[in-house]
Amino acid sequence: MDKLLIAVLGHRNSGKTTTWTSLFERTVKTGKSLRRLYLNEKEYVVVFLISGSPEEREKDVEELITVENPAIVLCSTQYRTDVMETYDYFINNGYSIFVHWLNPGYNDSDLVYFDSLGLTPRLLGNGATLTIHNGKENPEFRVQELREYIYGWAKYRDLILSD
C-alpha cells in the first residue's frame, strides 16, 4: 500500500491536538491543501492534516479531505461508536493504518480504559498498527515515535523531500 493514515485516537480533550502541535512544532489546524511535515531539519514529507476529528465535527472524513488522493493523511479520531466509519473509509481506499491511541487521554481518569467498542480486533484484523500511549505524559517521546514511523514508511517509498 502506497498511502498512509496516521490516526491519533482518543476521547474528547485527550491530547490529539497537542500531538499535532508537537509533531509540527507549531499550532496547526485542518487545512484545505497539502503541507510539509518536517521529519528532521532538512527532510520532509507532504501530508494532509485533519486536526478536528470527523466524529466531533459530525462530518464524513471524505468531506474533510479537500485534495485528491493524498499519500499521507494525519487525522484525529474520537473514541466513540461512529469512529469505525472513518477507519473504514481509509481501509476501503487502500491506506496503511497506524493508530496512536491516547489511553488514558489527558482529561481521562488515570486508568487505561477497556476497548468497549471492539476497535482493537477490527483495526488489527485489517492490518493496522496500533500503539497505546498515556496522553497525560509529555508528548515528546510518543511524537518522536510517530516521526520515525512516518520517516521509515516514506523513505521506503521514496517520498522524502528536502530543502
Task: Tell me what each language-model feature is.
Residues 28-29, 155:
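A generic secondary-structure boundary signal that marks alpha-helix termini
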Residues 3-25:
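Glycine-rich phosphate-binding P-loop
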Residues 1-3, 70, 94-96:
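A general structural motif
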